[in-house]
């Protein structure tokens, strides 16, 4: 089995979302599992300079920026396709996702690769039979409240890609009671049944 772990916190050291994702990975992985790791703060590029064709630019028409963007996009799509389980850790920044996580979703959303359009115009996700775990942290935002624009968006994106089995581990409102939030998150991880 392949487990794809994606960390998006801008903090390398002292990140609660990264630490919880690591604990989750230790809980679910088996010795024979292959781990694919991606730190979105290491080489993420942002979608820019595209025309109305979106992510469908012929290779001969790509400039250097496009080539770098498509190279990373192809790698991200490959990582998603190859994985059986996906762990995404993300803090809520200003009520939404980290910019690098949004960039990841933009680069991973590829027609014919992660989704397609049906004849009736509706979308269909192509990444079936996968499970995702979201590890969401926040300072003051209550998870799934009307101020949380990360969790529902990320669930929607994964569903858009065809990933319908999504479980959330949360350590929210840490600024109000850090110890309680961490204890609850650890309990959520401990309850996971494989």
Predicted regions and their residues:
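N-terminal beta1-alpha1-beta2 submodule of the flavodoxin-like/Rossmannoid cofactor-binding fold
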Residues: 1-90, 95-103, 188-194
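Residues at the starts of beta-strands that form the adenosine-phosphate
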Residues: 2, 34, 130-132, 164-165
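Short histidine/acidic/glycine/proline-rich micro-motifs that form metal-
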Residues: 10-12, 139-142, 173-176
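A short, structured loop/turn motif at beta-sheet edges
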Residues: 29-31, 127-130, 161
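Active-site donor-binding loop signature of nucleotide-sugar glycosyltransferases
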Residues: 40, 137, 171-173
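Glycine-rich, flexible loop/turn motifs
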Residues: 46, 122-123, 165
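Helix-loop-strand module that forms the ligand-binding subsite of alpha/beta enzymes
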Residues: 68-152
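Glycine-rich phosphate/pyrophosphate-binding loop and the adjoining helix
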Residues: 144-194
